[in-house]
């Protein structure tokens, strides 16, 4: 293991439990508030582990990693996680066994979609208001999965063609499962990991991906050659949620009224990898 990449608290009924995703890919569980950790061997000892890791040039810290660990709020035994270089997986027995959730997902042209290691989910989110719905920002588009189905639908094809549906973060509304936000990056063959045309914007869907609206009021109108990483965008739980994002150029932005109005609140920070928001009583 090179480093811990993702931390997720366990189910509300298990207040001392935590899950950790690592780079290279590994999944660990703590039952004492993080004092001690135990690997989940069904993941860490999987014979495909070396394939998930990729080659030397795909190494840490920006290469393979296990992320997007989700605990079903209705069932502490039901877990979902994703791997960059290993697809999306689901367990219904606290990680003792797993099944893949890659049906319907596309891969880079020339690769085999039936090969799990060819899949590169960037961020997966479960809707708090409807835990049977998942959204995913993938290396190859934006997707939605509605249970009990097992097939992802690519909902990013309705994004503007000049922008595309490639990016890293995925944010869902705390109370409306039809509302979700993404932050696209330049997904051309160059893959510069910057905003398309240097004009950053969030996009929102209010109908589960049938249409998308650009949200850029207050954001730079040009020459903003940055993007947002998978953990660096989130929303609060206010009646009209605000969005919060950190950029690869070290800026922190708030998008009030569900992202309708953006303002900068900090500059000249290091590259921002994660943003969280908490209400202080």
Residue ranges and their predicted role:
Residues 1-281:
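Extracellular glycan-interacting surfaces
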């Amino acid at each position: 293991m090179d480093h811990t990449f993702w931390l997720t608290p366990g189910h509300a009924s298990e207040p001392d439990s935590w899950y950790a995703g690592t780079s290279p890919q590994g999944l660990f569980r703590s039952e004492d508030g993080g004092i001690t950790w135990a690997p989940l061997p069904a993941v860490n000892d999987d014979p495909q582990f070396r394939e998930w890791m990729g080659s030397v040039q795909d190494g840490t810290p920006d290469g393979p990693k296990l992320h997007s660990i989700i605990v079903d709020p209705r069932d502490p035994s039901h877990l979902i996680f994703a791997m960059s270089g290993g697809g999306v997986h689901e367990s219904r027995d606290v990680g003792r066994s797993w099944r893949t959730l890659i049906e319907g997902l596309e891969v880079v042209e020339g690769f085999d979609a039936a090969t799990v290691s060819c899949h590169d989910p960037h961020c997966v989110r479960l809707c708090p208001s409807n835990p049977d719905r998942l959204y995913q920002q993938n290396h190859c588009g934006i997707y939605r999965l509605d249970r009990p189905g097992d097939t992802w639908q690519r909902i990013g094809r309705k994004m503007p063609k000049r922008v595309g549906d490639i990016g890293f973060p995925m944010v869902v509304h705390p109370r409306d499962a039809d509302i979700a936000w993404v932050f696209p990056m330049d997904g051309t063959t160059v893959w510069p990991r910057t905003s398309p045309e240097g004009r950053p914007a969030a996009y929102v869907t209010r109908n589960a991906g049938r249409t998308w609206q650009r949200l850029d009021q207050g954001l730079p109108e040009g020459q903003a050659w940055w993007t947002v990483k998978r953990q660096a965008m989130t929303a609060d739980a206010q009646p009209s949620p605000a969005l919060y994002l950190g950029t690869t150029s070290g800026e922190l932005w708030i998008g009030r009224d569900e992202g309708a109005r953006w303002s900068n609140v900090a500059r000249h920070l290091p590259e921002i990898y994660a943003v969280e928001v908490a209400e202080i009583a």
